[in-house]
């Protein structure tokens, strides 16, 4: 039996605008406020190619600093009780924007990608089997719509745009304890509540990769068990990046011991990771051009 592992390069090779640079353009067009906040607080890179990993490096200190103009002194001459909440409101607004609102815009963008446009691609993938199994990191239905692969043959590990409202985005934000460094009775209540807002929204929205992967592996135990007869794995459009390493290691444990791994490459392409790092034997791995699959 054959297993295909599908990454975003698969959709891009079909001419679909599924890269983070395309999401950047979408946000710039549809939500300028969110766009500006991402540019200011998330080190996503010029084309937002680092967006997922950068969600673990949100500059929360800058969020707090930029909101300090709303932190009125209790000794100000025109003090009003309304000032009790202005600072927390501003921090809360930014954290909501960079968590729930970002995820909502991301889901809307994915759902708006027209898979039918893939028919216009000049670079076609060699025929793939409908009887094979598919482990997809993509949110789209390219396999179903273009190749007529049945839903039951595919696992969308980060969610499917047709069925899931809560697509998985972001793998790195870990809050093992509060970000607040000065918890205590002497701390300004407004500042403490602002830290609570950051802890809650980012911690709940962007789970660390280890937790996500462990949860998914447990939830999809039936799928991983079904891989016991797989003797060939073909990787299409995935960089083999370390962030997904646990998936590859789990797949390798689930398939036949001497299964053959075939990694498809564009001409001149280099992968950012290596299957050997995920316990795949070097002797079982072949790197081939797409047209030679």
Task: Locate predicted features.
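A Trp-anchored, charged/polar loop motif used as the substrate-binding/catalytic surface
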Residues: 114-123, 208-225
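An N-terminal structural lobe/cap that precedes and organizes the functional/catalytic core
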Residues: 1-36
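Extended, H/D-rich, highly charged conserved domains that either
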Residues: 36-201
